[in-house]
Protein backbone atom coordinates (compact mmCIF):
# COMPACT_ATOMS: atom_id res chain seq x y z
CA UNK A 1 0.00 0.00 0.00
CA UNK A 2 1.08 3.57 -0.58
CA UNK A 3 -1.09 4.91 2.26
CA UNK A 4 -2.96 3.21 5.10
CA UNK A 5 -5.50 5.21 7.09
CA UNK A 6 -6.50 3.48 10.33
CA UNK A 7 -9.16 4.07 12.99
CA UNK A 8 -11.45 5.80 10.52
CA UNK A 9 -15.22 5.95 10.96
CA UNK A 10 -16.39 5.59 7.38
CA UNK A 11 -19.46 7.03 5.69
CA UNK A 12 -19.12 5.10 2.44
CA UNK A 13 -22.37 6.20 0.76
CA UNK A 14 -22.52 2.83 -0.93
CA UNK A 15 -26.04 1.71 -1.81
CA UNK A 16 -28.33 1.09 1.12
CA UNK A 17 -29.15 2.81 4.37
CA UNK A 18 -25.95 1.67 6.08
CA UNK A 19 -23.89 3.67 3.60
CA UNK A 20 -24.85 6.84 5.47
CA UNK A 21 -24.31 5.60 9.02
CA UNK A 22 -20.72 5.90 10.34
CA UNK A 23 -18.95 2.58 10.63
CA UNK A 24 -16.98 1.26 13.56
CA UNK A 25 -13.25 2.08 13.22
CA UNK A 26 -11.88 0.71 9.96
CA UNK A 27 -8.82 0.97 7.75
CA UNK A 28 -8.53 2.30 4.21
CA UNK A 29 -5.67 1.04 2.08
CA UNK A 30 -4.71 3.18 -0.90
CA UNK A 31 -2.56 2.07 -3.80
CA UNK A 32 -1.79 3.87 -7.07
CA UNK A 33 -4.37 6.54 -6.27
CA UNK A 34 -7.24 4.12 -5.76
CA UNK A 35 -8.97 2.55 -2.78
CA UNK A 36 -7.43 -0.92 -2.58
CA UNK A 37 -8.59 -2.15 0.82
CA UNK A 38 -11.47 -1.56 3.24
CA UNK A 39 -11.44 -3.57 6.45
CA UNK A 40 -10.28 -3.81 10.04
CA UNK A 41 -6.63 -4.76 9.48
CA UNK A 42 -4.35 -2.08 10.96
CA UNK A 43 -1.07 -3.85 10.25
CA UNK A 44 -0.99 -3.91 6.45
CA UNK A 45 2.36 -2.98 4.95
CA UNK A 46 2.24 0.61 3.72
CA UNK A 47 4.72 3.30 2.75
CA UNK A 48 2.84 5.73 4.97
CA UNK A 49 0.37 5.05 7.78
CA UNK A 50 -1.84 7.61 9.55
CA UNK A 51 -3.95 6.94 12.63
CA UNK A 52 -7.12 9.00 12.25
CA UNK A 53 -8.13 8.43 15.88
CA UNK A 54 -11.81 7.94 15.14
CA UNK A 55 -12.29 10.86 12.76
CA UNK A 56 -15.17 10.70 10.31
CA UNK A 57 -14.31 10.00 6.66
CA UNK A 58 -16.66 10.71 3.76
CA UNK A 59 -16.07 10.67 0.04
CA UNK A 60 -14.39 13.88 -1.03
CA UNK A 61 -17.01 16.52 -1.81
CA UNK A 62 -17.65 17.28 -5.48
CA UNK A 63 -18.78 20.72 -6.62
CA UNK A 64 -20.38 19.92 -9.97
CA UNK A 65 -21.36 23.45 -11.06
CA UNK A 66 -19.12 26.50 -10.65
CA UNK A 67 -18.08 29.66 -12.49
CA UNK A 68 -14.84 30.00 -10.52
CA UNK A 69 -12.77 31.70 -13.22
CA UNK A 70 -13.63 35.36 -13.70
CA UNK A 71 -12.34 38.87 -13.10
CA UNK A 72 -13.97 41.90 -11.54
CA UNK A 73 -16.44 42.63 -8.76
CA UNK A 74 -20.22 42.99 -8.83
CA UNK A 75 -21.05 44.00 -5.28
CA UNK A 76 -22.75 47.10 -6.73
CA UNK A 77 -25.37 44.83 -8.30
CA UNK A 78 -25.98 43.30 -4.89
CA UNK A 79 -26.92 46.76 -3.65
CA UNK A 80 -29.14 47.35 -6.71
CA UNK A 81 -31.06 44.15 -6.11
CA UNK A 82 -31.57 45.07 -2.46
CA UNK A 83 -33.13 48.31 -3.74
CA UNK A 84 -35.61 46.28 -5.76
CA UNK A 85 -34.06 46.10 -9.23
CA UNK A 86 -34.66 42.54 -10.57
CA UNK A 87 -31.83 40.46 -12.00
CA UNK A 88 -33.45 40.39 -15.45
CA UNK A 89 -33.52 44.20 -15.58
CA UNK A 90 -29.88 44.44 -14.49
CA UNK A 91 -28.98 42.07 -17.32
CA UNK A 92 -30.98 44.03 -19.89
CA UNK A 93 -29.14 47.21 -18.86
CA UNK A 94 -25.82 45.61 -19.77
CA UNK A 95 -24.98 44.52 -16.26
CA UNK A 96 -25.09 41.02 -14.99
CA UNK A 97 -23.03 38.56 -16.93
CA UNK A 98 -21.79 41.14 -19.44
CA UNK A 99 -20.14 43.31 -16.79
CA UNK A 100 -18.04 40.31 -15.79
CA UNK A 101 -17.36 39.60 -19.47
CA UNK A 102 -15.73 43.00 -19.91
CA UNK A 103 -13.49 42.52 -16.86
CA UNK A 104 -12.56 38.96 -17.79
CA UNK A 105 -11.63 39.89 -21.36
CA UNK A 106 -9.23 42.52 -20.06
CA UNK A 107 -7.51 40.14 -17.62
CA UNK A 108 -4.50 38.04 -18.53
CA UNK A 109 -4.32 34.33 -17.73
CA UNK A 110 -2.02 35.14 -14.81
CA UNK A 111 -4.44 37.73 -13.46
CA UNK A 112 -7.38 35.36 -13.80
CA UNK A 113 -5.47 32.65 -11.98
CA UNK A 114 -4.53 35.04 -9.17
CA UNK A 115 -8.17 36.05 -8.66
CA UNK A 116 -9.51 32.49 -8.94
CA UNK A 117 -7.24 30.69 -6.47
CA UNK A 118 -8.69 32.29 -3.30
CA UNK A 119 -12.18 31.23 -4.38
CA UNK A 120 -10.94 27.71 -5.04
CA UNK A 121 -9.25 27.68 -1.63
CA UNK A 122 -12.61 28.39 -0.02
CA UNK A 123 -14.14 25.35 -1.69
CA UNK A 124 -11.20 23.13 -0.76
CA UNK A 125 -11.50 24.22 2.88
CA UNK A 126 -15.07 22.90 2.81
CA UNK A 127 -13.89 19.43 1.83
CA UNK A 128 -14.04 19.65 -1.96
CA UNK A 129 -11.73 17.29 -3.86
CA UNK A 130 -13.27 17.62 -7.35
CA UNK A 131 -14.63 20.75 -8.98
CA UNK A 132 -16.30 21.56 -12.28
CA UNK A 133 -15.31 24.94 -13.74
CA UNK A 134 -17.16 26.65 -16.59
CA UNK A 135 -16.07 29.24 -19.09
CA UNK A 136 -18.68 31.75 -20.22
CA UNK A 137 -17.26 35.15 -19.33
CA UNK A 138 -15.16 35.51 -22.47
CA UNK A 139 -17.68 34.96 -25.29
CA UNK A 140 -14.96 35.20 -27.94
CA UNK A 141 -12.83 32.36 -29.21
CA UNK A 142 -9.66 33.74 -27.62
CA UNK A 143 -11.24 34.56 -24.27
CA UNK A 144 -13.22 31.34 -23.89
CA UNK A 145 -10.03 29.39 -24.59
CA UNK A 146 -8.19 31.59 -22.08
CA UNK A 147 -10.72 30.76 -19.38
CA UNK A 148 -10.59 27.03 -20.04
CA UNK A 149 -6.80 27.05 -19.91
CA UNK A 150 -6.88 28.79 -16.55
CA UNK A 151 -9.45 26.27 -15.32
CA UNK A 152 -7.29 23.33 -16.39
CA UNK A 153 -4.23 24.89 -14.76
CA UNK A 154 -5.85 25.01 -11.31
CA UNK A 155 -4.84 21.41 -10.59
CA UNK A 156 -1.21 22.44 -11.09
CA UNK A 157 -1.51 24.91 -8.22
CA UNK A 158 -3.82 23.06 -5.82
CA UNK A 159 -4.53 19.43 -4.94
CA UNK A 160 -7.88 19.05 -6.72
CA UNK A 161 -9.41 17.36 -9.74
CA UNK A 162 -10.76 19.91 -12.22
CA UNK A 163 -13.42 19.23 -14.86
CA UNK A 164 -13.65 22.11 -17.37
CA UNK A 165 -16.94 22.87 -19.16
CA UNK A 166 -17.42 25.12 -22.19
CA UNK A 167 -20.20 27.65 -21.57
CA UNK A 168 -19.77 29.97 -24.53
CA UNK A 169 -23.58 30.08 -24.80
CA UNK A 170 -23.85 31.93 -21.49
CA UNK A 171 -24.94 35.33 -22.79
CA UNK A 172 -25.09 37.21 -26.07
CA UNK A 173 -21.86 39.22 -26.47
CA UNK A 174 -22.18 42.87 -27.51
CA UNK A 175 -20.55 42.13 -30.88
CA UNK A 176 -23.58 39.99 -31.75
CA UNK A 177 -26.35 42.24 -30.44
CA UNK A 178 -29.57 41.31 -32.23
CA UNK A 179 -27.86 38.33 -33.90
CA UNK A 180 -28.24 35.47 -31.46
CA UNK A 181 -28.47 32.83 -34.19
CA UNK A 182 -25.22 34.10 -35.72
CA UNK A 183 -23.50 33.80 -32.35
CA UNK A 184 -24.76 30.25 -31.93
CA UNK A 185 -23.31 29.40 -35.34
CA UNK A 186 -20.02 31.01 -34.32
CA UNK A 187 -19.94 28.79 -31.24
CA UNK A 188 -20.68 25.70 -33.30
CA UNK A 189 -18.33 26.43 -36.17
CA UNK A 190 -15.40 28.05 -34.37
CA UNK A 191 -15.33 27.43 -30.62
CA UNK A 192 -16.62 23.88 -30.09
CA UNK A 193 -14.38 22.27 -32.75
CA UNK A 194 -11.24 23.87 -31.30
CA UNK A 195 -12.16 23.06 -27.70
CA UNK A 196 -12.79 19.44 -28.67
CA UNK A 197 -9.59 19.19 -30.70
CA UNK A 198 -7.42 20.61 -27.91
CA UNK A 199 -9.33 18.67 -25.21
CA UNK A 200 -9.92 21.83 -23.20
CA UNK A 201 -13.33 20.70 -21.91
CA UNK A 202 -15.25 17.47 -21.48
CA UNK A 203 -18.75 18.93 -21.78
CA UNK A 204 -20.70 21.86 -23.19
CA UNK A 205 -23.30 23.91 -21.29
CA UNK A 206 -25.97 26.36 -22.46
CA UNK A 207 -27.94 29.01 -20.54
CA UNK A 208 -31.39 28.09 -21.87
CA UNK A 209 -33.56 30.90 -20.57
CA UNK A 210 -35.69 33.88 -21.55
CA UNK A 211 -32.67 36.17 -21.07
CA UNK A 212 -30.29 33.60 -22.55
CA UNK A 213 -30.87 31.28 -25.50
CA UNK A 214 -34.07 29.68 -26.70
CA UNK A 215 -34.81 26.00 -27.15
CA UNK A 216 -33.84 25.82 -30.83
CA UNK A 217 -30.55 27.61 -30.21
CA UNK A 218 -29.82 25.35 -27.26
CA UNK A 219 -30.46 22.25 -29.34
CA UNK A 220 -28.15 23.52 -32.08
CA UNK A 221 -25.31 23.73 -29.54
CA UNK A 222 -26.18 20.35 -28.01
CA UNK A 223 -26.16 18.63 -31.39
CA UNK A 224 -22.82 20.19 -32.29
CA UNK A 225 -21.28 19.20 -28.97
CA UNK A 226 -22.39 15.58 -29.35
CA UNK A 227 -21.05 15.55 -32.90
CA UNK A 228 -17.64 16.52 -31.51
CA UNK A 229 -17.68 13.91 -28.75
CA UNK A 230 -18.50 16.24 -25.87
CA UNK A 231 -21.11 15.66 -23.16
CA UNK A 232 -24.05 17.95 -22.41
CA UNK A 233 -25.04 20.05 -19.40
CA UNK A 234 -27.73 22.71 -19.18
CA UNK A 235 -28.73 25.79 -17.21
CA UNK A 236 -32.47 25.18 -17.41
CA UNK A 237 -35.76 26.34 -15.91
CA UNK A 238 -34.18 28.87 -13.54
CA UNK A 239 -36.42 31.84 -14.29
CA UNK A 240 -39.08 30.32 -16.55
CA UNK A 241 -40.10 27.02 -18.11
CA UNK A 242 -38.82 26.75 -21.68
CA UNK A 243 -38.49 22.97 -21.77
CA UNK A 244 -34.71 23.00 -21.56
CA UNK A 245 -34.57 20.23 -18.99
CA UNK A 246 -36.52 17.81 -21.18
CA UNK A 247 -34.26 18.72 -24.10
CA UNK A 248 -31.17 18.09 -21.97
CA UNK A 249 -32.56 14.72 -20.91
CA UNK A 250 -33.34 13.81 -24.53
CA UNK A 251 -29.67 14.35 -25.36
CA UNK A 252 -28.71 12.21 -22.33
CA UNK A 253 -27.11 15.22 -20.71
CA UNK A 254 -25.05 14.82 -17.58
CA UNK A 255 -27.19 17.28 -15.65
CA UNK A 256 -29.90 19.91 -15.82
CA UNK A 257 -29.12 22.68 -13.34
CA UNK A 258 -31.23 25.23 -11.41
CA UNK A 259 -34.68 23.77 -12.37
CA UNK A 260 -36.80 25.97 -10.09
CA UNK A 261 -39.52 26.19 -12.77
CA UNK A 262 -39.33 22.53 -13.78
CA UNK A 263 -42.78 21.07 -14.56
CA UNK A 264 -44.00 17.47 -14.16
CA UNK A 265 -43.25 16.68 -17.82
CA UNK A 266 -39.65 17.76 -17.26
CA UNK A 267 -39.38 15.60 -14.15
CA UNK A 268 -40.66 12.61 -16.10
CA UNK A 269 -38.12 13.31 -18.84
CA UNK A 270 -35.34 13.25 -16.25
CA UNK A 271 -36.66 9.99 -14.83
CA UNK A 272 -36.47 8.37 -18.27
CA UNK A 273 -32.83 9.41 -18.64
CA UNK A 274 -29.64 9.31 -16.60
CA UNK A 275 -29.58 13.10 -16.33
CA UNK A 276 -29.05 14.45 -12.81
CA UNK A 277 -31.12 17.30 -11.39
CA UNK A 278 -28.61 19.76 -9.94
CA UNK A 279 -29.91 22.12 -7.27
CA UNK A 280 -28.24 25.51 -6.80
CA UNK A 281 -29.61 26.88 -3.53
CA UNK A 282 -27.03 29.66 -3.35
CA UNK A 283 -28.48 31.43 -6.38
CA UNK A 284 -32.03 30.81 -5.13
CA UNK A 285 -31.11 32.40 -1.80
CA UNK A 286 -29.08 35.30 -3.20
CA UNK A 287 -31.74 36.27 -5.75
CA UNK A 288 -34.44 35.91 -3.08
CA UNK A 289 -36.42 33.64 -5.38
CA UNK A 290 -39.71 32.11 -4.27
CA UNK A 291 -40.31 29.38 -6.88
CA UNK A 292 -39.01 26.18 -5.29
CA UNK A 293 -37.69 23.25 -7.35
CA UNK A 294 -40.17 20.33 -7.39
CA UNK A 295 -38.24 18.34 -4.78
CA UNK A 296 -41.03 15.96 -3.79
CA UNK A 297 -41.80 15.13 -7.41
CA UNK A 298 -38.12 14.47 -8.09
CA UNK A 299 -38.11 12.11 -5.11
CA UNK A 300 -41.23 10.32 -6.30
CA UNK A 301 -39.71 9.68 -9.72
CA UNK A 302 -36.34 8.65 -8.30
CA UNK A 303 -34.38 11.40 -10.03
CA UNK A 304 -30.90 11.80 -8.49
CA UNK A 305 -30.40 15.27 -7.04
CA UNK A 306 -26.98 16.90 -6.88
CA UNK A 307 -26.11 20.12 -5.03
CA UNK A 308 -23.52 22.63 -6.20
CA UNK A 309 -22.24 26.04 -5.19
CA UNK A 310 -22.74 27.82 -8.53
CA UNK A 311 -19.88 30.09 -7.44
CA UNK A 312 -20.22 33.21 -9.58
CA UNK A 313 -19.96 36.97 -9.07
CA UNK A 314 -23.55 37.90 -9.79
CA UNK A 315 -25.93 35.39 -8.23
CA UNK A 316 -24.02 33.03 -5.92
CA UNK A 317 -20.76 34.45 -4.52
CA UNK A 318 -20.38 31.56 -2.08
CA UNK A 319 -17.26 29.42 -1.83
CA UNK A 320 -18.38 26.84 0.74
CA UNK A 321 -20.10 23.66 -0.41
CA UNK A 322 -21.23 22.74 3.11
CA UNK A 323 -23.10 26.05 3.23
CA UNK A 324 -24.93 24.89 0.10
CA UNK A 325 -25.79 21.64 1.90
CA UNK A 326 -27.31 23.66 4.72
CA UNK A 327 -29.26 25.83 2.28
CA UNK A 328 -30.53 22.77 0.41
CA UNK A 329 -31.87 21.41 3.69
CA UNK A 330 -33.36 24.63 5.04
CA UNK A 331 -34.66 26.14 1.78
CA UNK A 332 -35.47 23.04 -0.29
CA UNK A 333 -36.20 20.63 2.60
CA UNK A 334 -33.67 18.00 1.63
CA UNK A 335 -32.56 15.63 4.36
CA UNK A 336 -28.91 15.77 5.50
CA UNK A 337 -28.40 12.38 3.86
CA UNK A 338 -29.79 13.67 0.56
CA UNK A 339 -27.55 16.71 0.89
CA UNK A 340 -24.43 14.61 1.44
CA UNK A 341 -25.26 12.30 -1.45
CA UNK A 342 -25.93 15.44 -3.48
CA UNK A 343 -22.33 16.63 -3.12
CA UNK A 344 -20.75 13.19 -3.51
CA UNK A 345 -22.49 10.28 -5.22
CA UNK A 346 -24.97 12.28 -7.32
CA UNK A 347 -22.49 15.07 -8.04
CA UNK A 348 -20.10 12.44 -9.39
CA UNK A 349 -22.83 11.24 -11.74
CA UNK A 350 -23.43 14.84 -12.82
CA UNK A 351 -19.82 14.97 -14.02
CA UNK A 352 -19.71 11.51 -15.56
CA UNK A 353 -17.77 9.91 -12.69
CA UNK A 354 -20.47 7.66 -11.24
CA UNK A 355 -18.27 4.57 -11.51
CA UNK A 356 -15.09 6.09 -10.11
CA UNK A 357 -15.83 8.81 -7.54
CA UNK A 358 -18.43 9.84 -5.01
CA UNK A 359 -18.34 6.72 -2.80
CA UNK A 360 -15.81 5.01 -0.56
CA UNK A 361 -15.52 1.75 -2.42
CA UNK A 362 -12.69 -0.55 -3.48
CA UNK A 363 -11.56 0.26 -7.00
CA UNK A 364 -12.77 3.86 -6.79
CA UNK A 365 -10.46 6.86 -6.84
CA UNK A 366 -9.08 7.62 -3.38
CA UNK A 367 -10.81 10.98 -2.94
CA UNK A 368 -11.70 11.49 0.71
CA UNK A 369 -12.65 14.22 3.16
CA UNK A 370 -11.64 13.64 6.79
CA UNK A 371 -13.66 15.50 9.39
CA UNK A 372 -13.57 16.28 13.10
CA UNK A 373 -17.31 15.75 13.56
CA UNK A 374 -19.53 13.17 15.23
CA UNK A 375 -22.10 12.49 12.52
CA UNK A 376 -22.43 13.28 8.79
CA UNK A 377 -25.54 15.36 9.51
CA UNK A 378 -23.20 17.88 11.18
CA UNK A 379 -21.99 18.90 7.71
CA UNK A 380 -25.44 20.26 6.87
CA UNK A 381 -26.30 21.39 10.37
CA UNK A 382 -23.42 23.66 11.37
CA UNK A 383 -21.50 26.11 9.19
CA UNK A 384 -18.47 28.27 9.96
CA UNK A 385 -16.35 26.09 12.23
CA UNK A 386 -13.06 24.49 11.22
CA UNK A 387 -14.19 20.90 10.85
CA UNK A 388 -12.03 19.66 7.99
CA UNK A 389 -8.98 17.73 9.16
CA UNK A 390 -7.60 16.63 5.80
CA UNK A 391 -8.37 15.77 2.19
CA UNK A 392 -7.14 12.89 0.07
CA UNK A 393 -7.13 13.45 -3.70
CA UNK A 394 -6.12 10.62 -6.01
CA UNK A 395 -4.39 9.03 -3.03
CA UNK A 396 -2.44 12.13 -1.98
CA UNK A 397 -2.97 13.16 1.65
CA UNK A 398 -3.13 16.87 2.49
CA UNK A 399 -3.88 18.07 6.01
CA UNK A 400 -5.98 21.20 6.20
CA UNK A 401 -3.67 24.04 7.16
CA UNK A 402 -6.15 25.62 9.60
CA UNK A 403 -6.81 22.40 11.46
CA UNK A 404 -5.34 22.43 14.96
CA UNK A 405 -5.45 18.66 15.62
CA UNK A 406 -1.96 17.28 15.11
Swiss-Prot record:
<dbReference type="Pfam" id="PF01979">
    <property type="entry name" value="Amidohydro_1"/>
</dbReference>
<keyword id="KW-0862">Zinc</keyword>
<dbReference type="GO" id="GO:0008270">
    <property type="term" value="F:zinc ion binding"/>
</dbReference>
<comment type="similarity">
    <text>Belongs to the metallo-dependent hydrolases superfamily. HutI family.</text>
</comment>
<protein>
    <recommendedName>
        <fullName>Imidazolonepropionase</fullName>
        <ecNumber>3.5.2.7</ecNumber>
    </recommendedName>
</protein>
<feature type="binding site">
    <location>
        <position position="65"/>
    </location>
    <ligand>
        <name>Fe(3+)</name>
    </ligand>
</feature>
<dbReference type="InterPro" id="IPR011059">
    <property type="entry name" value="Metal-dep_hydrolase_composite"/>
</dbReference>
<dbReference type="GO" id="GO:0050480">
    <property type="term" value="F:imidazolonepropionase activity"/>
</dbReference>
<feature type="binding site">
    <location>
        <position position="67"/>
    </location>
    <ligand>
        <name>Fe(3+)</name>
    </ligand>
</feature>
<dbReference type="GO" id="GO:0019557">
    <property type="term" value="P:L-histidine catabolic process to glutamate and formate"/>
</dbReference>
<feature type="binding site">
    <location>
        <position position="65"/>
    </location>
    <ligand>
        <name>Zn(2+)</name>
    </ligand>
</feature>
<keyword id="KW-0378">Hydrolase</keyword>
<dbReference type="InterPro" id="IPR006680">
    <property type="entry name" value="Amidohydro-rel"/>
</dbReference>
<comment type="function">
    <text>Catalyzes the hydrolytic cleavage of the carbon-nitrogen bond in imidazolone-5-propanoate to yield N-formimidoyl-L-glutamate. It is the third step in the universal histidine degradation pathway.</text>
</comment>
<keyword id="KW-0479">Metal-binding</keyword>
<feature type="binding site">
    <location>
        <position position="74"/>
    </location>
    <ligand>
        <name>4-imidazolone-5-propanoate</name>
    </ligand>
</feature>
<keyword id="KW-0963">Cytoplasm</keyword>
<dbReference type="InterPro" id="IPR032466">
    <property type="entry name" value="Metal_Hydrolase"/>
</dbReference>
<feature type="binding site">
    <location>
        <position position="170"/>
    </location>
    <ligand>
        <name>4-imidazolone-5-propanoate</name>
    </ligand>
</feature>
<keyword id="KW-0369">Histidine metabolism</keyword>
<dbReference type="InterPro" id="IPR005920">
    <property type="entry name" value="HutI"/>
</dbReference>
<comment type="pathway">
    <text>Amino-acid degradation; L-histidine degradation into L-glutamate; N-formimidoyl-L-glutamate from L-histidine: step 3/3.</text>
</comment>
<feature type="binding site">
    <location>
        <position position="235"/>
    </location>
    <ligand>
        <name>Fe(3+)</name>
    </ligand>
</feature>
<feature type="binding site">
    <location>
        <position position="315"/>
    </location>
    <ligand>
        <name>4-imidazolone-5-propanoate</name>
    </ligand>
</feature>
<dbReference type="GO" id="GO:0005506">
    <property type="term" value="F:iron ion binding"/>
</dbReference>
<feature type="binding site">
    <location>
        <position position="312"/>
    </location>
    <ligand>
        <name>N-formimidoyl-L-glutamate</name>
    </ligand>
</feature>
<feature type="binding site">
    <location>
        <position position="137"/>
    </location>
    <ligand>
        <name>4-imidazolone-5-propanoate</name>
    </ligand>
</feature>
<feature type="binding site">
    <location>
        <position position="67"/>
    </location>
    <ligand>
        <name>Zn(2+)</name>
    </ligand>
</feature>
<feature type="binding site">
    <location>
        <position position="235"/>
    </location>
    <ligand>
        <name>Zn(2+)</name>
    </ligand>
</feature>
<feature type="binding site">
    <location>
        <position position="137"/>
    </location>
    <ligand>
        <name>N-formimidoyl-L-glutamate</name>
    </ligand>
</feature>
<feature type="binding site">
    <location>
        <position position="310"/>
    </location>
    <ligand>
        <name>Zn(2+)</name>
    </ligand>
</feature>
<keyword id="KW-0408">Iron</keyword>
<dbReference type="GO" id="GO:0005737">
    <property type="term" value="C:cytoplasm"/>
</dbReference>
<feature type="binding site">
    <location>
        <position position="238"/>
    </location>
    <ligand>
        <name>4-imidazolone-5-propanoate</name>
    </ligand>
</feature>
<feature type="binding site">
    <location>
        <position position="314"/>
    </location>
    <ligand>
        <name>N-formimidoyl-L-glutamate</name>
    </ligand>
</feature>
<dbReference type="GO" id="GO:0019556">
    <property type="term" value="P:L-histidine catabolic process to glutamate and formamide"/>
</dbReference>
<feature type="binding site">
    <location>
        <position position="310"/>
    </location>
    <ligand>
        <name>Fe(3+)</name>
    </ligand>
</feature>
